[in-house]
């Protein structure tokens, strides 16, 4: 009988998976991790009820990059990720695009989400007050509703619509 210790290989594989699923700038889940989460949920339909998502979009990241440089833009992205993470502690957070984030709201109630959004707004205001530009995070959320949604895709589309409505209100 030959026994081989594969502990190091297992740990290395786990470390590579964590690295593969993390956004290098913010440390939150990346688009690949987000897509894996959605694939998992779609292949386990019993997990879909109760699913919810908060879509977040940073206001004027391109303008910040153009006017103040990419270092300042990167700081804006990192600080925004921290703000979102602090407003929704323990909730999975993903950066799915340059200025787009998604929070998985499973297990949270309407009141918790509202409190999280308010905390986010206060933190963004404090960040803006001490900065050379006006930071902003537009956010919209939706929970899976069997009366409205045929899939998680339609739940995400509703959250995205609410986020763009908020973004429009913030600009006007």
Each language-model region and where it sits:
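Catalytic-core segments of nucleotide cyclases and related cyclic-nucleotide turnover enzymes
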Residues: 9, 70, 114-121, 125, ...
């Amino acid at each position: 009988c030959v026994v081989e210790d594969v502990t190091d290989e297992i740990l290395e594989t786990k470390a590579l998976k964590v690295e593969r699923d993390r956004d290098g700038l913010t440390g939150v889940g990346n688009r690949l991790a987000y897509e894996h989460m959605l694939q998992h949920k779609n292949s386990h339909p019993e997990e879909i009820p109760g699913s919810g998502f908060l879509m977040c979009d940073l206001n004027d990241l391109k303008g910040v990059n153009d006017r103040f440089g990419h270092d300042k833009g990167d700081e804006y992205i990192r600080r925004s990720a921290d703000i979102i993470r602090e407003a929704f502690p323990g909730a999975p957070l993903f950066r799915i695009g340059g200025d787009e984030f998604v929070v998985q709201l499973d297990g949270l109630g309407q009141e918790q989400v509202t409190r999280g959004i308010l905390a986010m707004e206060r933190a963004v205001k404090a960040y803006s007050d001490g900065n050379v530009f006006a930071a902003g995070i537009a956010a919209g959320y939706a929970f899976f509703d069997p009366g409205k949604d045929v899939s998680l895709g339609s739940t995400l589309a509703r959250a995205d619509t609410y986020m763009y409505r908020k973004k429009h209100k913030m600009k006007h």
